[in-house]
Amino acid sequence: MRITGVVQAGGLSTRMGGEPKALIELGGRRIVEWVVAAIAPVVDDVLVVTNTPERYAFLGLPMVGDVFPDHGSLGGIYSGLKAATGEAAFTVACDMPFLRADVARIVLAHAGEADVVIPRVGEQLETMHALYSKACLPHMEAKLRAQRLKIVGFFDQVRVLEIPEDEVRRLADPAVVFMNVNTPDELARARELERSHGR
């Protein structure tokens, strides 16, 4: 199965004072560069969902805008999946600096077994570290047109395979590998992790 890696870079970064969080430098590279470096080895191609392509041109990757602007993360996931050259899209956020290829492989190993393959950590489904098949598109579109934007809102209409937390934990601390940098406090924590653990 051909799988496209999709980096979601459509957020407004309002909690970071408007500075695009993906472009913040951490450990000598911009966060989005760490994201691409983590997923590129395990997918067939990578694209970026963004409404500001000029900011991400330096990556040299295909870029697509939101099909449904201002429809939140579900709109971004839909746009990336629709544009994906593969039969499925491995979707990640642009602000996850500690993503790891080996953790991604746990998800991708189950490609073809379900329409959504997604890790669960406690009560949280990691919707921005998940594999979505093209079979999800009509169900996503119906929710988007109805303005029902909760990502998991269409899950009861497709086959979902959850990856147990302990599978992730065998390789990495889920609190680190799935960490988002949404706020200045989270950025400070990421810098501390970078200093203490390196790569």
Language model: regions and residue ranges:
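Nucleotide and nucleotide-moiety/phosphate-recognizing core
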Residues: M1-R148, D156-A175, A188, E192-G198
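A residue-level signal for conserved active-site and pocket-lining positions in enzyme catalytic cores
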Residues: F155, T183
